[in-house]
Amino acid sequence: MDEKLLQFFHSLDRSLFIDNRYKTLAHLDRPLPIGHGQTISQPSLVVYMTAHLQLDKTTRVLEIGTGSGYQTAFLAEFSQEVYTVELRGDLGAKARQRLDALGYGNIRYKLGDGSLGWAEHAPYERILVTAAPKRMPEDLIGQLAPEGIMILPLGPPGYQQLLMVTKDKQGEVTQTKLLDVAFVELVGKYT
């Protein structure tokens, strides 16, 4: 694992992204509720997914599900620009306040159905989906750049597979299973 990623992980206070009633649990490696049936992912999984995206400062990333903004901070730290889409306005607004307070100026925010992506700014070199669709979101595949990587959980509630989806120069798409996971369900066209 990249040393800079681990250093950032240890320097970022997860409690900044959690409501007061759960702050004492922020140090635990487990998901925690953030409202509306959504969760902040466990820290080890955030680091794992970020590492598999293979980010650098020239990368443009589409994030589906801003949530608390915790994962967004990792993306913003290691990429050129982040486009993040959140369905729930109050979650998106809180995340934006947190990320603005941390000084991130390379994030663009959108309120809407994340399963549709953000076509106006496509293609993206990397896409991260932080909630699980039941079927592959074709709109997101279409917005993935050639030689791009998408990480997403896929499957029914309670049991999904974390996949790495790659697209080659010719547009051929390949899926690789990374882990068995349990994410909240993605709400939108692909649910």
What name fits each language-model region?
Residues M1-L62, T66, Y70-F78, L91-I107, ...:
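Class I SAM-dependent transferase core
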Residues Q54-Q170, T174:
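Conserved nucleotide-cofactor-binding alpha/beta core module
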